[in-house]
Amino acid sequence: GLDCEIVELTPHCPVPAEEACALVVRGWSPETADAALKSTASIAYDTFMYMHGKVKNAHTRHLVFAAERARDPERERGVHTVLPWSGLEAMDRARAFISGALDTQHLKAGCVLKYPDINRTGIGWHGDGERRITVLYRVGAASARRPIHLMWFQKGEAVCAPISIPLGHGDFFVPSAKAVGTDWKLRNKP
């Protein structure tokens, strides 16, 4: 069987809030995780980002996207590389597994992120305004040193301590729609 855990997030919020939780699937197929890590090492990542109408050099994270069809980058327009799932076989196996486990056909696209210096870079607190369905597949030895941190916010201020969820090499993290943070810009509700 699988080693799965539901992490309840709502009890951490001191004010009334919608139910939120995350599913963590630990250690599925170490062989697939090893192959996925190996394949990500040879990717030519995009090192730019598009913010506030401008293309800038990305210092905190580098990325490429994955989907059924490939697409070349257009840096001057802020359009990132899309690699075909067929060229990311181990990642595609992981996607097929978690899609089947969740009984969903909605995991069509992915984003492969690389943090150039795991000890000095990361991203700040934010929600995901574009996606309600999000799955994270963590690979790499540094995973154990970098848990996922979640926090409840209201009116732009934190209303609880960070909720840390440790993830290891080959673990999946599946937040509920509320935990994804699609409403993160709505300041009045946690």
Role assignments for model-derived ranges:
Residues G1-P190:
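Non-heme Fe(II) oxygenase metal-center motifs and adjacent flexible, charged/small-residue loops
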